[in-house]
Structure formats: structure tokens, C-alpha cells
Amino acid sequence: MAVVTMRELLDAGVHFGHQTRRWNPKMRRFIFTDRNGIYIIDLQQTLTYIDEAYEFVKETVAHGGNILFVGTKKQAQEAVANEAERVGMPYVNHRWLGGMLTNFQTVSKRLARMKELQAMDAAEDGYQGRTKKEILLLNREREKLERVLGGIADMTKVPSAMWVVDTNKEHIAVSEAKKLGIPVVAILDTNCDPDEVQYPVPGNDDAIRSANLLTSIISSAVEEGRKARAERQAAAAKDAAGDTGKSEADAEAVKAEAAAEEKAETTEA
């Protein structure tokens, strides 16, 4: 079964690119034509690239990897948060902090601070002995950290790969991923640079419906990958149990054989 149909892509407006005066010549090969000063993306190619991206994400997750969802522009914020949360993956949908990947050790300290403030807020006597002004400042600090880091609260290491909506807006995130050798899967509009990503998905990164559809496809790939991982783990556990049972049976056979030999020796004596 196809990951997505041509009709679904058309209905979501994935084929609409930018105005012809706003483009990156490197995207020429992904453009079908232009109409009324707007580039039209070749959706036949998009379908092929979606399949490649889907398979990559699925296999990455199946082998224990995690995918960081990134989309801070207004049109992508809701889709990125909803789809990432649906499949239990980290996400950034408000502001990318410089060094979020390349200086993850420092980010981890800020995550620890956020959790400390959350625990303080949840405890009945968490603010005991503090003034109203101090409590107000602590709450503001917590809310600010939650806004920026809430989506990666459970991320304990840099991601295995990254899904990005609008590589131009998220150029810092893409640059950090490149420095660390983290593969990037991304929507590439007609003003983007395809050389910046490993798994391009030519499409409209400005329309809400397009961002929703393409991000949901990636989250579905994550879902399939998690199922495949669970199946592999179950099969491995079954094999291990079988080997254990076999070993125990072999041990019993050896013991029985030794007992028989001992009995025979006693009889002969």
C-alpha cells in the first residue's frame, strides 16, 4: 500500500512552490512547471522521495534510533508538536536554541533546571519560605524553559535523525546536524538548498495542510519502525528462551548419561 497518494498531495497543496523570483536554482530538477508566477513542484518525484524518507525513518527507529521533529514557523508548530507527541519523539516547535545539538551538555543542564522547577511547582511546600516576587520569577523561568525545551524534556542524547519543516528558517538546526553527521529529512520548497539534506521531500513548506500531511507521514514511519523494533525484540527474546531451554535439556541429558554410567559401574563392581 502506498504511503500517500497523488490526490492527497494535491488536496494538501504540496505542489505549490514559491514565486518564480524567489527560488534556488538547485531546486530546478524538482520543478514541473510554473503557473501565474508560481512554481509547481513535480509531485511524481515527491512521491518517490517520500517513499525513500519513509523507509529511512522506519529503519532508523526499528534499530533503536530516535527522530527529532523541528518546525518553529507558525504553519508547522501544531503539526510538529502533535505528531511528535503521538509517537513519543522529541520536538522543537518554538525557538531553536543555538547549540541545542552541538552543545547538548549545556542544554542538558537547562533541562535539569526545568525539571527542578517543575518539581518545585508540583510539590505542596515547594515554594515554602519564598516571597511572592521570588515565586513569580521562578514561575516565569519555568514557563520560559518549558516553552523552548518542553518538547525535548525526555531527550537524553542527540537524535539519530531529524525531520525539518523549512530548512531556510531552521538553518541553524540543519547546520548543527550537519556538523554532527546527523541525517536530515526535510520538506524542500523551491527556495531551499537540496544539498543541505540527505533525504529531501520536495514540497510546500508554507501551507498548514501540506506541513500537516508530510509531518504525519514521517510520524507514521516512526510508528511502523517502533512496531518493527518490538517484533524484533520479541523474536530475539523467544530465540533466547529457546536456547535456554535447549541448554537446560542438554544439561539434563548429560546428567542422565553420567548417572547411567555410574550405575553401570556400580553393577559391574
UniProtKB/Swiss-Prot annotation:
Q: Which domain of life is it from?
A: Bacteria
Q: Where is this region: Disordered?
A: 228-269
The keyword Repeat is assigned to this record: no
Q: Which GO terms describe its biological process?
A: translation
Q: Which cysteines are joined by disulfide bonds?
A: none
Q: Does the keyword Ribosomal protein apply?
A: yes
Q: Name one GO cellular component term.
A: cytosolic small ribosomal subunit
Q: Which CDD domains match?
A: RPS2
Point to the regions of Low complexity compositional bias.
233-244
User: What segments bear the compositional bias annotation Basic and acidic residues?
Assistant: 245-269
Q: In this record, what's one Pfam family? A: Ribosomal_S2
User: SUPFAM superfamilies this protein is in?
Assistant: Ribosomal protein S2
- Keywords, in A-Z order: Ribonucleoprotein, Ribosomal protein
Query: What InterPro entries does this protein map onto?
Result: Ribosomal_uS2, Ribosomal_uS2_bac/mit/plastid, Ribosomal_uS2_CS, Ribosomal_uS2_flav_dom_sf
Q: Which GO terms describe its molecular function?
A: structural constituent of ribosome
The text of the family note is: Belongs to the universal ribosomal protein uS2 family.
- What is the protein's given name? Small ribosomal subunit protein uS2
Question: Could you tell me which species this protein originates from?
Answer: Corynebacterium urealyticum (strain ATCC 43042 / DSM 7109)
